[in-house]
């Protein structure tokens, strides 16, 4: 987290030690960006490469999660902790910065969608959403379909369907006692009364996604390496 590095550098009397994982030749690699931040704040920076050689160890890592866990970033988190503990015993993670200060790219997407809602009437957006269902299900058209679909609804309803659309949920939850009345949007709109939709989304991610995903991941993988990580 560049924000965490900036704040920690401001209050520290000595240069910070910073660490990151490098994914060579992949679009997920942020090591160059991390290096730029390190240079700007004059930290002692170390990056560790990760590649397919770690795959045979993944089943063992899964066993140490203690529960079903659907975030594959626990794998690089484990190897980062494994390397960091060679130099320090307590580390500060960057967790929480994106949720508190709207750092995720998805927040920009939500803001763009919201600007479209303000610009075009419901009838136009609904018609485009219906037409988008005729597009083929391909990688290049998926984002366009999602954009048109999301703009059929208000911001919070669209946010609550970011993983599965309502038709997809209807297909998955089509039996037994599963509820299909979609109460999430009403809940999210009132997550923090009196603030705008972006603050509600950030707080929802902070109190749910970060707590039930990010902190669990970091806690399991850091303790597996006898490293204490604080957020």
Positions of the model-derived regions?
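Structural motif
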Residues: 70, 192-205
């Amino acid at each position: 987290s560049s924000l965490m590095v900036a704040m920690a550098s401001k209050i520290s009397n000595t240069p910070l030690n910073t660490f990151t994982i490098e994914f060579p030749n992949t679009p997920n690699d942020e090591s160059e960006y991390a290096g730029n931040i390190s240079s700007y704040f004059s930290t002692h920076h170390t990056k560790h490469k990760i590649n397919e050689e770690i795959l045979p160890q993944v089943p063992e890592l899964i066993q140490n999660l203690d529960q079903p866990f659907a975030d594959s970033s626990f794998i690089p988190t484990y190897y980062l902790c494994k390397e960091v503990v060679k130099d320090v015993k307590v580390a500060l993670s960057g967790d929480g910065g994106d949720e508190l200060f709207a750092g995720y790219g998805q927040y920009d997407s939500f803001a763009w969608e919201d600007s479209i809602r303000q610009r075009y009437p419901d009838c136009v957006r609904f018609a485009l959403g219906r037409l988008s269902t005729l597009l083929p299900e391909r990688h290049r058209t998926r984002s366009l379909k999602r954009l048109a679909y999301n703009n059929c609804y208000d911001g919070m309803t669209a946010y609550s369907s970011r993983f599965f659309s309502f038709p997809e949920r209807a297909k998955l939850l089509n039996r037994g006692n599963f509820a299909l009345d979609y109460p999430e949007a009403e809940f999210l709109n009132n997550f923090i009364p009196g603030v705008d939709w972006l603050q509600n989304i950030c707080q929802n991610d902070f109190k749910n996604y970060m707590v039930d995903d990010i902190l669990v991941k970091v806690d399991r993988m850091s303790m597996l390496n006898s490293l204490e990580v604080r957020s």
